[in-house]
Amino acid sequence: IIDCGERLGDGQAYKAVNQLLCSVHIVAAAEALSLAGRLGLDEESVLAAMTAGAGQSWMLADRGPRMLAGLDAPVASAVGIFVKDTTLVADLAADLDIDLALLPVAARRFAAAAELGLARR
């Protein structure tokens, strides 16, 4: 359990920050593994190297193997959840007049996946 402060709503604010990072990290991980494959590299070897180096993130280590396993991999959090969460974070950013340049990119990727019928994956 993490103490998120005394003010009402601080826990939700922490969650928004977390979801921004998670959304962007998942998309970055997918693009990195896609690049590795297009370069003719063994994606599993690249994943092992990246999770041991400066480019590692929890999402890369957790979701990377599932990405390589394909659609039969167990689902940890559905695409539809990220569609919802990126929308909530985007609304919050608009209210605060803050430019979160990577968020719209991640949001479009999740929305595109949902449109392909992967919202529950």
Model-derived features with residue positions:
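Helical "substrate-binding/catalytic lid" subdomain
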Residues: 10-121
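General beta-strand structural signal in soluble alpha/beta enzymes
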Residues: 2-5, 102
